[in-house]
Every structure is written in C-alpha cells, then in structure tokens.
Amino acid sequence: MQIDNLEIRQAVWRDLPEILNIYEIARCFMAANGNAGQWGTEHPKEEILREDMAQGRLYAVTKHEKICGVFALISGADPTYTRIDGGNWHKEEPYLTIHRIAGNGTARGIFAACLEFAKQGSSYLRIDTHEKNRVMRHLLEKNGFRYCGIIYFRDGSPRMAYDYSVESTDLSG
C-alpha cells in the first residue's frame, strides 16, 4: 500500500538486518531525547521480531524501495490493556494495536502512513508509549489519538495508553 511517498508492505526475512538497525537507531534517538528507559538497549529482541514476521504482523515502511521504518500491527485483545488506571478506553470493541513503531530518520511521515494503513484494517486502534517519549506523545495527539489512562506491562512498568476511533476523528475534524 502506498501512502504519500511511502510504501508499506509485510516485512520478510531478508529485511531483518535492516529492521534491527532501525531499532538500534531508534533506541539511540530515544536515549538522546531523555527516554532511555522505554526500550533500553535491547528492545525489541530479535525473537519478538521473528515471531511478528512469522505471524504476518510486522510491516516495513519503504521510500524508493529502501526500508525507512517498521511497525507491528496486532489484531486481538492485548492482555496488557485489560487493566487501565486513571481513565478508560473510549470503546470496548475489537481493535488493532500498533506496537514497536520506529524509523531511521531518512523519511518524514512514517507515523501518519502507519496510521492510514492501520485504519484500513480497523476503525478502532490502540497504542501505548512511555511518559518520557515526548516525540511519540506529540505524534499521537497531533494525529487524533485520545489519552485513556495508564496500563502496565507484566513487569509492572507503566505506559500511557491512547486510542483512536475513525468515527470520533471524523466528527471532530
């Protein structure tokens, strides 16, 4: 699928070295911008990416046939979204979750392209991010995501949870 000057396709095994490089670039960017804790030095682990690829839920964003971004789009209930503190999800219906979105800095509009792609699969989306990830929080708010509350990973670490509904953004925009 092509969105603006970016194309989105399922990631394939030969993409893995470049995808790993993109995540390394993203971790360095996050650390340099005060968010070293969200992904640390190893997240996402290669095993997670291999599982995402095997399940057909890892996507490569390309510009002129070169990978510039990556994200996972996951269908079904996310167990970490069962408990939410300080708020509520705006809807209780099937959703897609955007996880592990990252770019290598060579293209603009990766998040917007990911959002347009995800909207083709569902009118209701969820995502979470670390409170120190100011860049992602800005992108979420700029693109019509609404803050819902705090969710917790298995290890107890909190994340800010957001959702997006095509209907609510169409009415307000």
Give the location of each predicted region:
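Conserved acyl-donor/pantetheine-binding loop and adjacent beta-alpha core of acyl/acetyltransferases
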Residues: 72-106
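A short helix-loop-beta-strand connector motif used in the catalytic cores of GNAT acetyltransferases and
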Residues: 47-60, 77-79
